[in-house]
Amino acid sequence: VTEAEFQQQIIDTARLLGWRCYHTFDSRRSEAGFPDLVLVRDRVVHLEVKSETGRLSPEQADWIAAINAAGGTALVVRPSMWEEIVASLKRR
């Protein structure tokens, strides 16, 4: 599964579970490293979507750390985490 396919799978599932989903389509024009997805329902979750072998850039790691340090939730997700991702999206 490609990163783009995995990302779409997350978006489709999240929407079915009542989440609002935001993705910047042309990230070249936005702040470097900002997470791929912002999901909003009863909480806000930022997701950086990676393939199994994909690596975080320093800017991505900085954004994730900053969001979490500010009390937010930012995670790196990979296809092998699918069951955990779905369980988290179902949780209220």
Q: Which residues make up each language-model segment?
A:
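Catalytic phosphate/metal-binding cores of nucleic-acid and nucleotide-processing enzymes, i.e., regions
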Residues: V1-R92
